[in-house]
From Swiss-Prot:
Any coiled-coil regions, as ranges: none
GO annotation terms (biological process): cellular response to oxidative stress
UniProt organism field: Staphylococcus epidermidis (strain ATCC 12228 / FDA PCI 1200)
Active-site residues from the entry: C36
Enzyme class: oxidoreductase
InterPro entries according to UniProt: Glutathione_peroxidase, GPX_CS, Thioredoxin-like_sf
Family designation: Belongs to the glutathione peroxidase family.
Its EC number(s): 1.-.-.-
Keywords: Oxidoreductase, Peroxidase
Protein name: Glutathione peroxidase homolog BsaA
Record-linked SUPFAM superfamilies: Thioredoxin-like (SSF52833)
Length: 158
């Protein structure tokens, strides 16, 4: 069976790397958009990151333009927007598709690994996947779930 650590992702500068560099970390993987009603969640996500990063907690943002065309720019533009408007310092990657024919393999894995949670395709921006230190998908959160509402779930894994 494949592991989350086998996946290769692209930074917003086009450089590729394997997720195995986060082995032993608690990860929160989020599909993001700069022009979405949920975009203010970047502020809450950054607060979570600031609070827990010293305990080996990482947030990985993956911009996506599949929902309402709310991420029209490049991954680099998305990252700049996040930094300028919300002070985001966690990694924002290159744009990906999170569903459909061109679905990024990581999001295929996440969606399937979340069986029994919400085993269905991602329906909107800011769907969040919580991964434990061993690489298991522990929980999937809907876009409506605000970052501060998932603190307890994160703390259980730290």
């Amino acid at each position: 069976m494949e592991s989350i650590y086998d996946f290769v992702v692209q930074k917003n500068n086009g450089e590729s790397y394997k997720l195995e560099q986060y082995k032993g970390d608690v990860m929160l993987i989020v599909n993001t958009a700069s022009e979405c009603g949920f975009t203010p969640q970047f502020e809450g996500l950054q607060k979570l990151y600031d609070e827990y990063k010293d305990q080996r907690f990482i947030i990985l943002g993956f911009p996506c333009n599949q929902f309402g065309g709310q991420e029209p720019g490049s991954g680099e533009e998305a990252a700049q927007n996040c930094k300028i408007n919300y002070g985001v310092t966690f990694p924002i990657h290159e744009k990906v598709d999170v569903k459909g024919d061109n679905q990024h393999p990581l999001f295929h894995f996440l969606t399937n690994a979340a069986k029994g949670m919400i085993n269905e395709k991602i329906k909107w921006n800011f769907t969040k996947f919580l991964i434990d230190r061993e690489g298991n998908v522990i929980k999937r959160f809907s876009p409506q779930k605000k970052p501060e509402q998932i603190k307890t779930e994160i703390e259980k894994l730290l």
